Amino acid sequence: MSKEVNQEECAPRTVEDVKEMLVKHSNGEIQRTIQNCITILQNDHVLADAIRLNLLSERIDIVKPVGWPRSGKTLNDIDMKYILRRMEKYGISSEKKIESAIRIVANENRYHPIRDYLNGLKWDGTERIAHVLYHFLGAAEDEYTCEAMKIFLLGAIKRVFQPGCKFETMLCLVGGQGAGKSSFFRLLAVKDEWFSDDLRRLDDDNVYRKLQGHWIIEMSEMIATANAKSIEEIKSFLSKQKETYKVPYETHPADRLRQCVFAGTTNRQDFLPRDRTGNRRFIPVPVDAELAEVHILDDEAESRAYINQLWAEAMTIYNSGNYKLAFSPAMQETLQAHQQDFMQEDAQAGMIYAFLEDYTGDRVCSKQLYAEALGNTNIPAEWETRAICEIMNTGISRGDIQGWQAHKTAKRYPKYGVQKGWERVTSPETGAEDFSEITDEIGRAHV
């Protein structure tokens, strides 16, 4: 008897069963309310448990077979037509109310596919983080490479579980074509739809759409063509924790917290423009396919199994809470040494140093150096004067430029107006008459 009862309880509800659950008017007619639409969506045997909000893509998914042909999980216009037709069986045809009910039901059945994936992993105890870049790409098996990989993996995990968390580090793989650098990041993203290499411009108003639904974003083209100006834009972009974007059906823009991390690949050995304040956001790791144990695409199934355990190991570290998303002070020195290996020749610094060796005046400003040391005739952009300031200040602090210091107040320069700049520690007898000191009040007005 109990077996028969259990079978009845498990049997799908018919349309008539669901109709009995709906609120009706006094004449027995079904009320066309949002709540009745919700009841249908939650209990109709075709639609029940089908509609969920994907917290990664921030879109509504249909997550089970629903009886009509479809491709992909995301709810689309054709799906809506089928749902509207299904709702007509209950005498409800208000598209607006049905759409509202769908959003409510989806929101109450939200899920995060990457969190579900990571939480479902069980580590086998074999360490792979320290070896993965050597295994697939022939990178060095040293502490620096291990820490670089660990920071990147833990940053990716934290971005998923704590969207919008601060993580502005880019792991950059440097090596020849065909080494498998892009394939490594694609497989590291676990599913191809969680990976993207389609980010081409950072000033695109729809940049959020390029990030939406992805976990690992490869920026190969921008890294390959980076210059001093674009590297500043990339650094600023990496430091963002959210995008503000209005989804078409929404009335107001909303903050979209970042859930992705960014990776770089290049075969350029001088991909990092000279940055005197440090390129701490970029972690370069040289790779050599000839030294790798396997090519990542030789046996894709085996590579994916390896990567599953890589994430399982990283999750074990993440759950322990015993980690930092930055290098130790000692390892920072190693990072800076690696960055120096991939920096472009600092031609501007050399030109400025040479100019100062022959210069007889007692003061210089960035605009003067831009024109007289670098030979430019146009007005410098802000980033260009900032680069000159970095050359001077870093050169002075490192001892590369001796006998100069930044002057404390703004000075008036005959050709360049009131400027902050640098002065000789011991001024020569000539040149002082060409400048006049500006009071703090005037200086602040011109900064």
Could you tell me what each predicted segment is?
Residues M1-R128, E143, E147, N378-W383, ...:
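N-terminal nucleic-acid engagement/recognition segments and initiation subdomains in replication
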Residues K89-H112, K166, E193-L199, D203-L238, ...:
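Feature primarily recognizes SF3-like P-loop helicase cores of small DNA viruses
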Residues I102-Q212, K367:
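P-loop NTPase catalytic core of nucleic-acid-dependent motor ATPases
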